[in-house]
Amino acid sequence: MTGRSGNIGGDRCSFCGRQHPQIAQLIEAPGRAAFICNECTDRAFELVRQNKAKGSEFRLEELPSPKEIKAYLDEFVIGQDEAKKALAVAVVSHYQRLAHPDVNLQKSNILLIGPTGTGKTLLAQSLAEMLEVPFAIADATTLTEAGYVGDDVENVIVRLLQAAEYDVAAAERGIIYIDEIDKIARKSEGTSITRDVSGEGVQQALLKIIEGTVAQVPPQGGRKHPQQELVQVNTKNILFIVGGAFENMAEIARARTNVRSVGFGAEHKGEEKEELRFLPEDLVKFGLIPEFVGRLPLVVQLQDLDEDALVRILTEPQGAIVKQYQALFGFQGVDLTFTEEALREVAHRAKARKTGARGLRAVLEKAMTDLLFELPIEGLKELRFDAENIDHPLALIESGGLKKSA
């Protein structure tokens, strides 16, 4: 587009009809005898900004109930009912707090504790999808204090801003999930006198943005420099969910309960194991600083997945692994089915890997890849996958464990 200054051939703004000297500049539309003046351009930009901000406002009447949130999570995550209920209530409370700023409500940041593959990340992601708010994921192990090699803590804000397509108002009501938070535990309970740039130092840096601050972030991420344009993002209404496996946490909690239950009326260990709940003091003992623990008022514990749950994960949720493979085979005109024995064996092997639901795909991947590589096969219409085919997938084709069209 071409910018014109002055009265050139009596050109007028096609929007307001004014011409020089009433306006300073005209911008000509390419290939057309149409113009817009600098003042109409400014006015259009402001209208776009206002409409965008209006679209970013949170409307309480659109907030789902806790039961609706749990029902939605049930479609994606198998089991973990207590965790889903706690998350649903916490999320509703958080966004009600945004809708009623005049009421003094504590920010409901959440700590998810559970073994690898139990659904921590998927729960957080599904919440954001249902609420239609921007969502960003960060790995705590990649974060360092400002000035050290690695990702600045504020880069997690940049990722959220990018997910919001640089709509600051939308980003300021988004959700950030920080995984592997247990990996930045400090080495001892005492205050460190030496630099721990990826442990206690990161906790201190995260503390500021989690409790609420106006962060000055470079829109494209990376390190700040003096000549760089920065974007202001207020984090006080961003919901932070952090998660980790916290291995050996049970031993810390058990040691506490054993000490307190010595003598008359002491609980039995078997009962204690079922009811074990982690307290803030356990998290501090593990290596989280007290101030950081204090900014995570809701601690949600996810349970390890048994084989029954893993079988359900294979087949039931939206995007279940079995459904995905059935779709891929369907594209080749093949109806793929799995026997109950096959599903049980996959779940059994995944359980042995101790990687939860993540292990399911790993168990099936090679067998499915080998079979898909052979397709298409003329006349092949059905495949019935059994437990033995996990290790010998091509036996399906070689031994007639398939059906061809007549």
Curated annotation (Swiss-Prot):
Claim: Heme is one of the keywords in the record: no
Keywords, alphabetical: ATP-binding, Chaperone, Metal-binding, Nucleotide-binding, Zinc
Binding locations of Zn(2+): C13, C16, C37, C40
Domain ClpX-type ZB: 1-56
Binding site for ATP: P115, T116, G117, T118, G119, K120, T121, L122
A cellular component annotation (GO) from this entry: HslUV protease complex
Gene Ontology terms: biological process: cell division; proteolysis involved in protein catabolic process
GO molecular function terms attached to this record: ATP binding; ATP hydrolysis activity; ATP-dependent protein folding chaperone; protein dimerization activity; unfolded protein binding; zinc ion binding
Similarity comment text for this entry: Belongs to the ClpX chaperone family.
Role according to the record: ATP-dependent specificity component of the Clp protease. It directs the protease to specific substrates. Can perform chaperone functions in the absence of ClpP.
Quaternary structure (record): Component of the ClpX-ClpP complex. Forms a hexameric ring that, in the presence of ATP, binds to fourteen ClpP subunits assembled into a disk-like structure with a central cavity, resembling the structure of eukaryotic proteasomes.
Name of the protein described by the UniProt record: ATP-dependent Clp protease ATP-binding subunit ClpX
